[in-house]
């Protein structure tokens, strides 16, 4: 197989939960570039949040917001941009407030919420630690009023709770305009930055996934999916891993993701799982 494009998730794949990047991962990325293979970052983060890493890795393309935005990074050209409508945002926000669920909204350069908590508090602390200010944090009094007045360009809404969110799936299933990803990392989402157990739903416009972003790049670059390699760890990586010619799951990945992978690494993320995958399939 002649690999022409390698797509990788960031958090939990190249970067571990402590925001550490194994040194060998940088060497592996250099190897990709030296072989003239396109390197694509696929992440749930917005471009404003991931830009520094994209620059650091010299990525050719970026799929951001789980597929809501695709950018040709070398030519600074936006290829795709999708957002949630005002009506759908109000639908989501009203529901969250009704059941006392935490909600925050991602625009392409802002995080909007009524209170920093859970994932958005984690992002704020990570950004503070990194000394980065690409993502602005906007605290509003009432998120529904803010949506009504300003109609922000939101690509993703995130609802969080300290217990299971599965009971709310049916509410979002009846809205054909939106789709959601249920994030559950080995039972509960917990790390060394926010010492609290919680789960979250990442809600975006319908038919938007990382894999759809790769399908677009497949057509844009005239590269068959069979000539692509995809690496990831969580449920929002599953389709791209399943549909790529070579799909790699890091050993830290969820069981569902490992079940569809061509290869599962022996090393953990902190030990250079990404580099292991690259070195196995690139001679």
Label each region the model flagged.
Residues 26-34, 97, 173, 215-219, ...:
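Surface-exposed amphipathic alpha-helices with a cationic face
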Residues 59-66, 180-181, 247-252, 266:
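Short hydrophobic/aromatic-enriched beta-strand-loop microsegments
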Residues 110-229:
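Conserved acidic, metal-coordinating active-site core of Asp-based
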Residues 57-58, 66, 175-176, 243-244, ...:
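Short, structured coil segments at secondary-structure junctions
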Residues 1-5, 9, 22, 200-283:
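Mg2+-dependent phosphoryl-transfer enzymes with acidic/Ser/Thr/Gly-rich catalytic loops
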Residues 18-129:
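Active-site phosphate-binding/coordination module
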Residues 36-40, 59-60, 153-156, 226-227, ...:
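Short active-site oxyanion
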């Amino acid at each position: 197989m002649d690999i022409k494009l390698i797509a990788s998730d960031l958090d939990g794949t190249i970067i571990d939960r402590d925001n550490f990047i194994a040194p060998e991962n940088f060497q592996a990325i250099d190897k990709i570039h030296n072989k003239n293979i396109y390197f694509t970052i696929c992440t749930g983060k917005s471009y404003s949040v991931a830009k520094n890493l994209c620059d650091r890795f010299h990525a050719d393309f970026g799929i951001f917001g789980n597929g809501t935005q695709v950018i040709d990074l070398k030519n600074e050209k936006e290829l795709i941009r999708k957002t949630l409508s005002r009506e759908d945002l109000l639908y989501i926000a009203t529901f969250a407030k009704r059941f006392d669920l935490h909600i925050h909204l991602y625009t392409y350069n802002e995080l909007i919420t009524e209170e920093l908590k859970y994932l958005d508090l984690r992002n704020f602390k990570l950004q503070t630690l990194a000394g980065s200010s690409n993502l602005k944090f906007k605290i509003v009094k009432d998120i529904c009023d803010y949506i009504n007045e300003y109609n922000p360009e939101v690509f993703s809404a995130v609802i969080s709770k300290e217990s299971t969110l599965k009971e709310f799936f049916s509410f979002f299933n009846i809205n054909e305009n939106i789709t959601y990803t249920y994030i559950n990392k080995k039972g509960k989402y917990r790390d060394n930055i926010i010492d609290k157990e919680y789960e979250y739903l990442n809600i975006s416009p319908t038919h938007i996934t990382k894999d759809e972003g790769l399908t677009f790049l497949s057509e844009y670059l005239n590269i068959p999916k069979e000539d692509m390699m995809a690496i990831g760890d969580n449920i929002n990586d599953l389709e791209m891993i399943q549909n790529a010619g070579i799909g790699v799951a890091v050993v830290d990945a969820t069981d569902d993701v490992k079940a569809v992978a061509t290869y599962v690494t022996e090393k953990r993320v902190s030990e250079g799982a990404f580099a292991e995958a690259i070195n196995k399939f690139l001679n």
